[in-house]
């Protein structure tokens, strides 16, 4: 409670100093670990000042809580804090939710009709760009920062679990063939290659190649 009150104080001070609103990245660590009620507490300071709550929602497909659980969370934050809501980004990002665009947009429209000021942004291309950890790593493996993640990798059981869960993530999205490493300063020869190609070079599985790149 003490930490949350301090966060509210910092949020209020920043808004009063000219910040346009509050932004969260609930898809990413460490933002992912924030509870909904904690975000609402901060968003209340936004609502009091008629400013904007912008969120990279917790899940854009089927990685963790699911697309519609995530969208409804953003709506509930706006409803309970009385602030404007901006969704980043409006998309159905996993095969499991492909074809759900109408349902997604209808939920936004129904929310507007309810009186909640909600909108979203969308980029006009089929690829996305993010960190390898955000795209593939299970959230439990990131909770202690890079040092803890490396400890997990050094443990045989945890490494096996990581490989299994990353492999499962491939099956829910574009697959290892759909992920391209754009920048890798440790070995620039791997830049521009897919994880399938890199796994072939390393003579290992795509999930194991992912861990080696992170290390």
Question: What is each residue range found by the language model?
Answer:
Residues 1, 7-28, 75-79, 83-215:
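Active-site neighborhoods of metal-dependent hydrolases
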């Amino acid at each position: 409670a003490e930490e949350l009150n301090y966060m509210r104080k910092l949020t209020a001070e920043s808004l009063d100093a000219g910040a346009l609103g509050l932004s969260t990245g609930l898809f990413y660590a460490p933002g992912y670990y924030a509870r909904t009620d904690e975000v609402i507490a901060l968003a209340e300071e936004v609502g009091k000042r008629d400013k904007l709550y912008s969120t990279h929602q917790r899940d854009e497909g089927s990685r963790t809580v699911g697309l519609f659980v995530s969208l409804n969370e953003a709506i509930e934050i706006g409803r309970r804090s009385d602030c404007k809501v901006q969704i980043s980004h409006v998309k159905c990002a996993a095969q499991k939710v492909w074809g759900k665009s109408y349902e997604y947009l209808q939920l936004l429209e129904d929310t507007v009709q309810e009186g909640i000021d909600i909108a979203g942004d969308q980029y006009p291309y089929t690829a996305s760009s993010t960190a390898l950890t955000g795209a593939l790593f299970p959230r439990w493996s990131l909770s202690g920062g890079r040092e803890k993640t490396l400890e997990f990798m050094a443990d045989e059981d945890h490494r096996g679990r990581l490989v299994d869960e990353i492999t499962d993530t491939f099956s829910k999205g574009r697959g290892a063939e759909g992920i391209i490493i754009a920048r890798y300063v440790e070995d620039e020869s791997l830049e521009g290659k897919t994880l399938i190609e890199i796994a072939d070079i390393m003579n290992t599985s795509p999930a194991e190649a992912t861990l080696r790149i992170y290390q």
